[in-house]
């Protein structure tokens, strides 16, 4: 047990950091506005065109501690004018500034961790597509998979306790506790039994959510790494990139401190793989379902007894990869069994050898994508293209450029699809919707307007990869078509298109 004691000890080097005085610094709110916001709520209110001062912030914090923070003095006309437009205005102001402040210990921790590990500062691992080559390489050798929705409708006090390991300033923690209890209902939005963050306060709650996720993953991945026979250094660097200002090895809090070696033996599996995305996680293993069940109940106990998040074990299904398809970041993942029969002739005897190989497939589900196009008024619910209403002063080139940008973004994101039929249909919908929009603007028929545009208009909807491959292999058309039909993963995609994010 002594050899693992270093993993359990939290870093005490920054216990004397006091973050509370930073709340009264004006540049903190300017920093939050410049880096985290598209628009400043401070400049949208009549009668207030200056930056938030320390006096304003002090008044806001004072009202948080009061029983009725919405009662203002009748003589304070400037405050009534400032606060009257949005009763949650000052909660947004403080949340924006507080989010910047509490990120400071994590950012300092990240910089020191990178300097200590001397990890390569590559941006490729931040790409969404960086996970697909990993899945393509691993999933074809695995047998069982389980997709789980991570519960994060947690108690407010658990959020504060999670930050206690990082933020040692008691005043800041007390302010956060009062702030969350007072404005919890206005900062979150219930939707289909899932709590999502309000668009007005995304930074603070994304930070709190990631801190909560990193807390449980530190325990989970620590047991996984210690019990594995194969320690991969590349996976450590990978997790540095996707985690939120944190290094996995830097803080670990294990529930089961008694008989630790038995716990490690209990979870021993060199082929257990873990992937997290969009509030969900994937567990995949090569072993029998028994080991998957062990990890399943470990996660349930961890969430229920450590984070006080209610979760039913029956909601975690364990499926065979060869019989199960998984919706993952706009793709539908599956492992298909390809069987081939080989005839072998040895002297006078012949044998038939049946070889079965697993192939990892990534398919673009067309029905959800058509639903997203329908909501954006590019087509109806059946997938028939329709004209999109446009502004009267929009030029033809602006309309065409908008459709081309959407088409190329979708094609760029779904370039890893093993079957391109869905992409061809999406291109057809966007191309014909563009023609109908232009024809509606000029009050002409679609056929007449399409003749006017000519074949050059259709060529503009070719994606970049099609154009590049056609230039490189212009003499061998079959080669370029075969390469384009293959899977292409780009390492510069850092966000999901709105039309793709249909989950």
Swiss-Prot record:
It holds the Pfam family MatK_N. The keyword Nucleotide-binding does not apply. The keyword Disulfide bond does not apply. One of its GO terms (cellular component) is chloroplast. Keywords: Chloroplast, mRNA processing, Plastid, RNA-binding, tRNA processing. Coiled coil: none annotated. One of its GO terms (molecular function) is RNA binding. It is found in: Plastid, Chloroplast. GO terms for biological process: mRNA processing; RNA splicing; tRNA processing. InterPro entries: Domain_X, Maturase_MatK, Maturase_MatK_N. Its main location: plastid. Disulfide bonds: none annotated. Belongs to the intron maturase 2 family. MatK subfamily. Usually encoded in the trnK tRNA gene intron. Probably assists in splicing its own and other chloroplast group II introns. PANTHER family: MATURASE K. This is Maturase K.
């Amino acid at each position: 047990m002594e050899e693992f004691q270093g993993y359990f000890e939290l870093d005490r080097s920054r216990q004397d950091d006091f973050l509370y005085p930073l709340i009264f610094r004006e540049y903190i709110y300017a920093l939050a506005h410049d880096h985290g916001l598209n628009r400043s709520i401070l400049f949208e209110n009549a009668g207030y065109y200056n930056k938030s001062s320390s006096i304003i912030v002090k008044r806001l914090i004072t009202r948080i501690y009061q029983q009725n923070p919405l009662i203002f003095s009748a003589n304070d006309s400037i405050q009534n004018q400032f606060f009257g437009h949005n009763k949650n205005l000052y909660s947004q102001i403080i949340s924006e500034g507080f989010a910047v402040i509490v990120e400071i210990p994590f950012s300092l921790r990240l910089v020191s961790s990178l300097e200590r590990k001397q990890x390569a500062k590559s941006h490729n691992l931040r790409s969404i597509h960086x996970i697909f080559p990993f899945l393509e390489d691993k999933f074809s050798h695995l047998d069982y998979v389980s997709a789980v929705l991570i519960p994060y409708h947690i108690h407010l006090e658990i959020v504060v306790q999670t930050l206690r390991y990082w933020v040692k300033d008691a005043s800041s923690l007390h302010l956060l506790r009062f702030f969350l209890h007072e404005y919890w209902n206005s900062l979150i939005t219930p939707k289909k039994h899932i709590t999502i963050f309000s668009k007005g306060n995304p930074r603070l709650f994304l930070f709190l959510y990631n801190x909560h996720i990193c807390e449980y993953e530190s325990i989970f991945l620590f047991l996984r790494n210690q019990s594995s026979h194969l320690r991969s250094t590349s996976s450590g660097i990978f997790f540095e990139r996707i985690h939120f200002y944190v290094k996995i090895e830097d803080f670990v809090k294990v529930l089961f401190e008694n008989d630790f070696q038995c716990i490690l033996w209990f979870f021993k599996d060199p082929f257990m793989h873990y992937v997290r995305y969009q509030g969900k996680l994937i567990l995949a293993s090569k072993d029998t379902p028994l080991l998957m069940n062990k990890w399943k109940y470990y996660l349930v106990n961890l969430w229920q007894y450590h984070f006080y998040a209610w979760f039913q074990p029956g909601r975690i299904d364990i499926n065979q990869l060869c019989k199960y398809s998984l919706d993952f970041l706009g793709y539908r993942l599956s492992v298909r069994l390809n069987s081939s029969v080989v005839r072998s002739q040895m002297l006078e005897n012949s044998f038939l050898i049946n070889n079965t190989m697993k192939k990892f497939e990534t398919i673009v589900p067309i029905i959800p994508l058509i639903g997203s196009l329908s909501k954006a008024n590019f087509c109806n619910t059946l997938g028939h293209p329709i004209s999109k209403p446009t502004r009267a002063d929009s030029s033809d080139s602006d309309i065409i450029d908008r459709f081309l940008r959407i088409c190329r973004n979708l094609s760029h994101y779904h370039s890893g699809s093993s079957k391109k039929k869905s992409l061809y249909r999406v291109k057809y919908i966007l191309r014909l919707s563009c023609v109908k929009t232009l024809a509606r603007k000029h009050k002409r028929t679609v056929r007449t307007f399409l003749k006017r545009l000519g074949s050059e208009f259709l060529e503009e909807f070719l994606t970049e990869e099609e154009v590049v491959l056609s230039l490189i292999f212009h003499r061998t058309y079959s080669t370029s078509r075969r390469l384009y039909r293959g899977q292409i993963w780009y390492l510069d995609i850092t966000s999901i298109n709105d039309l793709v994010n249909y989950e």
